[in-house]
């Protein structure tokens, strides 16, 4: 068995609360989001893991989540690598719009297709497949080698960037990943074999509140 990979979706952001398409826009966490990140950190502290390195996106809501988690596990000065390859899916022309307003403008069915299809992007934005096309190569070249070296690696990122990873790690179909929702602030602990396949997966919290 090789190293450990922990994935955490950022806590609730201001725009999650306001029901806005966020994407690459950069709101911070709400009070609830801070609580969620702290809860995830407390779960990891209780689990007893100490990390060798952390990765996060170029967006403040993921970076803030990571900082809160690292404080909880007693590693505030851990090496942290930030890269936009781990950013949320880019919603293009939908970014900043209220989801109800978007449905009024383009129709509920069209917005549903943009949100929930695998390979149909919104205007000027990315599909889930597009998101995976930047996340997965970054994982393979930057993150996975450290896990396979036996390190314990923490990744704090976003719903869709993490779904892109989980799709491959959990061997989900396109239909399976579209049905997958990740709760905010809930760590997923993967232990990997030396051949990079998953040896075990443990969820430290409740995924039933995912959205």
UniProtKB/Swiss-Prot annotation:
Superkingdom of source: Bacteria
Q: Which reaction does it catalyse?
A: (2R)-2-phosphoglycerate = (2R)-3-phosphoglycerate
- Recite the UniProt keywords alphabetically: Gluconeogenesis, Glycolysis, Isomerase
Active-site residues are 10 (tele-phosphohistidine intermediate), 88 (proton donor/acceptor)
Q: Where is this site: Transition state stabilizer?
A: 158
The EC number(s) this enzyme carries: 5.4.2.11
Has keyword Isomerase? yes
InterPro entries xref list? His_Pase_superF_clade-1, His_PPase_superfam, PG/BPGM_mutase_AS, Phosphogly_mut1
Which family is annotated? Belongs to the phosphoglycerate mutase family. BPG-dependent PGAM subfamily.
Described by its record, this protein's role is as follows: Catalyzes the interconversion of 2-phosphoglycerate and 3-phosphoglycerate.
Q: Which HAMAP family match?
A: PGAM_GpmA
| Name listed for the protein in its UniProt record | 2,3-bisphosphoglycerate-dependent phosphoglycerate mutase
Classification of source organism: Bacteria, Pseudomonadati, Pseudomonadota, Alphaproteobacteria, Hyphomicrobiales
């Amino acid at each position: 068995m090789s190293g450990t990979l922990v994935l955490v979706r950022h806590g609730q952001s201001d725009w999650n609360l306001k029901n806005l398409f966020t994407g690459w826009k950069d709101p911070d966490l709400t009070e609830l989001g801070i609580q969620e990140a702290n809860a995830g950190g407390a779960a990891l502290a209780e689990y007893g893991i100490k990390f060798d390195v952390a990765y996060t996106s170029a967006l403040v809501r993921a970076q803030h989540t990571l900082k809160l988690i690292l404080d909880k596990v007693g590693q505030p000065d851990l090496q942290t690598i930030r890269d936009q390859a781990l950013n949320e899916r880019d919603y293009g022309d939908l970014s900043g719009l209220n989801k109800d307003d978007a449905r009024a403008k383009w129709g509920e069915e069209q917005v549903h297709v943009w949100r929930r299809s695998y390979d149909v992007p919104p205007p000027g934005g990315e599909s889930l497949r597009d998101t995976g096309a930047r996340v997965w190569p970054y994982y393979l070249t930057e993150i996975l080698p450290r896990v396979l070296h036996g390190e314990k690696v923490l990744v704090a990122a976003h719903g869709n960037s993490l779904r892109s990873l989980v799709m491959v790690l959990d061997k989900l179909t396109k239909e399976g990943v579209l049905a997958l929702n990740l709760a905010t602030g809930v760590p997923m602990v993967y232990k990997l074999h030396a051949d990079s396949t998953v040896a075990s997966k443990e969820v430290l919290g409740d995924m039933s509140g995912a959205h």
